[in-house]
């Protein structure tokens, strides 16, 4: 069973000043993680950082850090009680440059703490160490023993030193993303909800870059109007389920890359998916909402944040002037979400009002007919062309590759290919107005 300590990228960046003080001394942080089942083991997602008392450190030196007795007791009590809520205590501390691993002193103190926590009913203890300019390393204390544990910052995975790295000739040109890139993507499980004009090329591009574990969900079949914008389709594919077409494309791509595809495909609507189907999606590491309506994207967003998954959505929009049909904008967009920081609802990229209107479809009858008659639901589908879908798909896949390789992340990218206007936001929470979000948990500024 693989175990991974997951820290959202934005949270990690926020912790760095405390973990690596400007005076060069060591830093210490305590937090709580939530265990989330994954396909190959358990993800421990860091969700809560325990605030440190102003005088909580007894000493902080270039080669050592220690808590006061009062602060240590307070954190230990919280750590023990966290077991009642299914949470796991996490201790993070830094080392000087050149000392990348846990010290003998770390071993002794953590073993003593783990023994005490077990007696208090908390069977687990996670610990992380990171040297300045180095990579984080983690371990899990369980049953009196140390267990190997990977670290994932956002989508960037740091493996234990003993982990063998995958090398494939077909993927050699991706070496710029780092030696561990192929190994990392081969272990990530990707859920794709919506495998239409954007979702299908995203699936193939990911497969050709080494991803091989997929969960696909889409209730629709291929229609004649899809043939101009879905890769590799012909008239013979009309009537086939899109998830079956996408699965076949992924398998071909994986064979070309030298990997073996593992796919679960559901011919289901995310808004009416079964408990089992949602449970399987929840085990993914990354969830992509590539549908064309607000309701399904909000459903995906809730599922991802609740399950500790990385979330991204992408789409296209060709807007036309009412009456004349004149094109006013041609846009592609990629955005994401992070617990406690931002989400598409905070940023105005999803409209809950429109989602409530779309929900009337599932009520049916007079409710749906009235929504149609009053113009809340477009009578014609939005324009869509293969070239624009390909740009959105490529932008999304590149964003995923950047995140896996540790090359930074964008919270929101939008490009209007008609006017040339570009929006590229890295720290979305800094641009949001005061207020709280019940979806991502962002607190008032």
Question: Where is each model-derived feature located?
Answer:
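A short helix->loop->beta-strand "cap" motif at the edges of active sites that frequently abuts
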Residues: 122-125, 259-261, 307-309
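Glycine-rich adenosine-cofactor-binding loop
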Residues: 178-223
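Glycine-rich phosphate-binding loop and adjoining beta1-alpha1-beta2 segment
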Residues: 211-258
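Glycine-rich phosphate/adenylate-binding loop
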Residues: 135-142, 181, 189, 273, ...
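Short acidic/polar active-site loop segments enriched in Thr and Asp
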Residues: 87-89, 212, 310
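A structured beta-alpha segment of the ubiquitous adenosine-cofactor-binding alpha/beta core
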Residues: 243-286, 291-297
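N-terminal charged helix/coil linker that caps or initiates catalytic domains
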Residues: 139-190
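Conserved beta-strand-loop surface patch within small alpha/beta domains used
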Residues: 1-90, 96-158
């Amino acid at each position: 069973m693989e175990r991974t300590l997951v820290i959202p990228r934005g949270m990690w960046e926020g912790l760095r000043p405390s973990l690596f003080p400007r005076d060069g001394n060591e830093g210490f942080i305590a937090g709580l993680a939530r265990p989330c089942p994954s396909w190959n083991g358990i993800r421990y997602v860091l969700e809560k950082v325990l605030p440190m008392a102003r005088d909580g450190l007894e000493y902080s030196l270039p080669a050592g850090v220690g808590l006061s007795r009062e602060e240590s007791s307070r954190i230990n009590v919280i750590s023990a009680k966290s077991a009642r809520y299914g949470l796991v205590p996490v201790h993070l501390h830094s080392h000087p440059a050149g000392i990348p691993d846990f010290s003998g002193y770390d071993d002794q103190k953590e073993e003593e703490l783990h023994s005490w926590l077990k007696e208090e009913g908390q069977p687990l203890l996670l610990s992380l160490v990171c040297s300045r300019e180095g990579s984080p390393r983690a371990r899990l204390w369980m049953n009196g023993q140390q267990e190997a544990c990977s670290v994932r910052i956002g989508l960037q995975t740091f493996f234990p030193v003993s982990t063998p790295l995958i090398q494939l000739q077909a993927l050699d040109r991706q070496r710029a993303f780092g030696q561990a890139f192929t190994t990392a993507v081969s272990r990530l499980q990707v859920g794709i909800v919506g495998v239409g004009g954007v979702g299908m090329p995203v699936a193939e591009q990911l497969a050709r870059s080494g991803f091989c574990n997929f969960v696909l969900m889409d209730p629709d079949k291929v229609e004649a109007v899809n043939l101009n914008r879905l890769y590799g389709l012909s008239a013979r594919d009309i009537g086939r389920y899109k998830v079956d077409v996408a699965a076949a494309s992924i398998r071909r791509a994986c064979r070309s890359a030298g990997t073996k595809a593992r796919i679960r495909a559901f011919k289901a609507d995310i808004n009416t998916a079964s408990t089992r189907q949602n449970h399987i999606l929840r085990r993914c590491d990354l969830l992509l909402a590539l549908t064309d309506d607000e309701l399904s994207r909000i459903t995906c967003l809730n599922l991802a944040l609740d399950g500790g998954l990385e979330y991204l959505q992408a789409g296209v929009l060709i807007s036309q002037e009412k009456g004349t049909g004149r094109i006013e904008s041609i846009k592609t967009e990629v955005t994401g979400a992070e617990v406690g920081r931002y989400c598409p609802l905070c940023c105005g990229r999803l409209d809950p009002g429109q989602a409530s209107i779309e929900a009337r479809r599932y009520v049916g009858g007079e409710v749906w007919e009235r929504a149609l008659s009053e113009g809340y639901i477009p009578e014609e589908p939005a324009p869509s062309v293969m070239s624009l879908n390909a740009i959105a798909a490529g932008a999304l896949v590149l964003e995923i590759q950047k995140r896996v390789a540790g090359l930074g992340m964008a919270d929101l990218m939008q490009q209007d290919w008609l006017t040339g206007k570009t929006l590229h936001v890295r720290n979305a929470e800094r641009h949001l107005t005061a207020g709280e979000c019940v979806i991502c948990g962002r607190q008032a500024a």
